[in-house]
UniProtKB/Swiss-Prot annotation:
Transmembrane intervals: none
Gene assigned in the entry: secA
Cofactor note: May bind 1 zinc ion per subunit.
Record organism: Xylella fastidiosa (strain Temecula1 / ATCC 700964)
Cofactor requirement: Zn(2+)
Protein name: Protein translocase subunit SecA
Protein family per UniProt: Belongs to the SecA family.
A molecular function GO annotation: ATP binding
Binding site for Zn(2+): 898, 900, 909-910
Protein residues bound to ATP: 87, 105-109, 508
NCBIfam families tied to this protein: PRK12904.1, secA
Keyword Translocase: yes
Amino acid sequence: MINSLLTRLFGSRNERQLRQLNSIVAKINALEAELQKLSDTALQAKTTEFKQSIQDGKSLDKLLPEAFAVCREASRRVLGMRHYDVQLIGGMVLHLGKIAEMRTGEGKTLVATLPVYLNALAGKGVHVVTVNDYLARRDAAHMGRLYNWLGLSVGVVYPGMPHSDKHAAYGADITYGTNNEFGFDYLRDNMALSKADRYQRGLHYAIVDEVDSILIDEARTPLIISGPADESPDLYIRVNRIIPHLTRQENEEAEGDYWVDEKGKQVHLSEVGMERAEDLLRQAGILEEGDDSLYAAQNLSVVHHLNAALRAHALYQRDVDYIVRDGEVVIVDEFTGRTLAGRRWSDGLHQAIEAKEGVPVQRENQTLASITFQNLFRIYKKLSGMTGTADTEAYEFQSIYGLEVMVIPTNRPTVRKDYPDQVFLNRSSKFNAVLEDIKDCAKRGQPVLVGTTSIEISEMLSEHLRKARVKHEVLNAKQHEREATIVANAGLPGAVTIATNMAGRGTDIVLGGSLDTVLAELDPDATEEDRFRVKTAWNRRHEAVKAAGGLHIIGTERHESRRIDNQLRGRAGRQGDPGSSRFYLSLEDSLMRIFASEWVQKVMRLMGMKEGDVIEDRRVTRQIERAQRKVEAHNFDIRKNLLDYDDVNNEQRKVVYAQRDELLDAESIKENIDSIRHEVIDALVTRFVPEHSIDEQWDLPGLQATLQSEWGLHLPLIEMLKGREEVDAERIAFLVQDAVDKHCAEREASIGAETMRALEKHVMLTVLDQGWKEHLATMDYLRQGIHLRGYAQKQPKQEYKREAFELFSEMLEHVKREVIASLARVRIRSEEEMAALEEQERRQVDTLLRQSQFQHQEAGGYGTGDEAVSLQRQPAGQRAAIAQVIRDTPKVGRNDPCPCGSGKKYKHCHGLVT
């Protein structure tokens, strides 16, 4: 109550901040008349003046009013567009490192020019992040005219561009690209073998367009660079053949072999189903006759393949979750409806779907490098974003990214009418109503945009409209090359456009059609009279569409997130234009069936409804929104859970990547190598000659043999120590260190100091990369089973952190040993031979990167996805056994003395076995 009273008195936080920014808007406006008097040359010279001021210590905040005023005046002269006051506010919000929520049609692309120009003056690079390559190239070309006029360089990065071009793009003051490309290049840079091979010059400032799509919707999709593994794909094909012989249950209690939990997106084998699957697998020769259980240790790979095949058949539908094109399974983005060429699901799911569809099955991939978007964008020193719908996710932006959301007022009041949802008993009644609404709009000359959740529905609607002879366009993943043309014409009188989800996002639908597109189609020799005639015709169309009610939005299904529904609605009513929206729902829709059907069915029964009847009630809409809020909260928990686990990986990633950067930047790492060598030798000697031990416990022959096999060093220790009294472990360590140092000095003298320095760097980088790659695979295995610790009354997250730390420490120790051993074994005779080795390694990395793929990993696991499913499918006896794991002796630490009494550390004795 007190809060609401204070808000009424002083305004909300958003309103108070807007008032503060309005005072700066007044300063910018006061400079406008003066700047308009300047010549082009004088205005362009302001950029050089600003750069000098920054070098002299002036802050960007102090420069902001004048820099924004200069950018606005330049935009007016070059682009013919002058920033409104609300756009100036949006620009300031972005500069302050916040998220600007701006409605569709408010000119977000133009708003971004203000903070981009200001921050690019610092010379550290600004990244403008878009959702697809088309928008990146379009905006770079269009806004590049303004930046170039002001003396700033612009680059754009996209997949497959030449190495030198990408270097130049990142060297520009402003770089446009997609979130995927910036992320991939960050990972590639951390696989580079020299400074010259790196693209990026640090992550300084990023403006993320459609920030909700990238930082929320895609936050469960880690970027993964992966290479093909060695396993044969044949097992996927053989396992796929048995799935049609298994029967799906209606629910958990019904008869059958497996049931599908749509809410949790899981598939469960019943007890009967497990026995049936075992029989079928034996008949197919996949399980041997003697195998007593599918879940025996030797059959874990078969379980992995069976789980993947069940999910492929039961949860993933063709033309909804993926399409088959040119003999390949291509993922369809659930949020945008676009195809994600090059992306692959992980954990064998993509291969299982390929086997299901009868296309060539590609090998599974091994992770080489990975990062989540959450951790990628948190690396930037300053981050901001803009979107039409962020306020519903304000808490997540603040808690995960530290980004505050500010709602920017519209330039003109919004007059769009949002009609209540219409709810039907079944899908056929719903789609009949949708078709009638479309036909009514087309008849009255009102353009209509129909939003669907899948390609399948968009094509079904298209077929019905074709039969009814209603002219229309379909915009989905299959037509994505024509996207810009379809969107440009979607505002024409009576135009009917069916769009999958939010395809076409980023391009405004202009009432009457796009004037720019029509003008661009004119002959280059067209006269002013021709242009005037085209503009007059467009004005007539524009007014006719406004009179018909503007753009009408039809939603054929509610999405899991209110934000995506709002994005669809937001396509209408841009810049004060008229418009309307309505959602048509049925009890058979996914969201209604899973989350809201029971309550609504109860209401429908009480009202005596039958097929074809409709409910149109605000209370139903509120109930649906309540269900959506539950789903949003659930999805947030999943993303937060992912981040908690990935933060562990991220700390390790930062250590490894910082080490790589030091290696690449250093002229010489001789001191590091010497230090590591002494450390490794100490550990080696301690392994065979433990400290404070008696000579009966020493293993001098073993130490001699190891020095010979791993180092190529013949050191007759036994002979050297014969007849000596008072010999202890410390003396032996000194003798070995001295011999190894002399051996290394001789090697360096034989090949030259410069070649040795290059060899040290090369070996250190190669071994570190290999160790990190193997560590990532180990961490994947740890993650997949960590939730089982809960059955032993332990906290999975704490266990994950503890074991991850131990694994990482062991990996670093292994890298040290391997570096020293490799340097001792490698035979290099000349500088030319060293250069050839480096070039060969570089070619291998290039080949690996060309073969690498972006896996669309479903990261909802860590005990909430496949891992939990595999446990639930196990026989009850096995589950109970897991729950009763109790340690009856104290755990032995890796560095504690081994309980066997050898005197060695546990990790060097029986710890090696475990």
